[in-house]
A protein has these predicted regions:
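A solvent-exposed, acidic/Ser-Thr-rich amphipathic alpha-helical stretch
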Residues: 24, 30-81
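A beta-strand edge to alpha-helix "cap/lid" segment located at domain peripheries
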Residues: 1-5, 61-133
Length: 133
């Protein structure tokens, strides 16, 4: 798959996330995708490590119930071979506490044969933890 096709897949996942379309989110993910939000998380209502599309269905369901998305903004896209790196920021409300989380993030998507096999997100874990403390 070409770099542009990989980039398009990531953009489609983001559109799915923004519009709550689970099918669009899961479509480009490999069955055994390795998904991790890097950092120390104790209070947030979702684990940081997920394996496979089935687990990710649960993850995105939990996110939809736990968060109100006020802003989800990918700002920069960097593509190199089988990797797409995206820099962005978000503003979300933790439904359980009513607290607002504003954080910048970097997401690294790794592709093989046109499917996402690995995802890593680097964000402000302290901001997320304080929203649920």
């Amino acid at each position: 798959m070409s770099e542009q096709e990989n980039l398009l897949s990531v953009r489609q996942v983001y559109q799915g996330f923004i519009h709550g379309d689970l099918g669009a989110i899961l479509k480009p993910l490999a069955e055994d995708v390795d998904w991790q939000i890097v950092g120390h998380y104790k209070n947030v209502p979702w684990p940081a490590v997920w394996r496979g599309r089935r687990e990710l269905e649960r993850y995105f369901t939990i996110l939809a119930e736990a968060l109100e998305v006020e802003l989800f903004q990918p700002d920069e896209f960097l593509v190199d071979g089988d990797k797409v790196v995206v820099l962005g920021h978000e503003r979300m409300v933790a439904r359980a506490t009513g607290r607002i989380v504003e954080a910048s993030w970097a997401q690294v998507w790794t592709f093989r044969d046109g499917l996402v096999i690995r995802y890593r997100e680097y964000t402000d874990s302290a901001a997320w933890e304080s929203a649920y403390a």
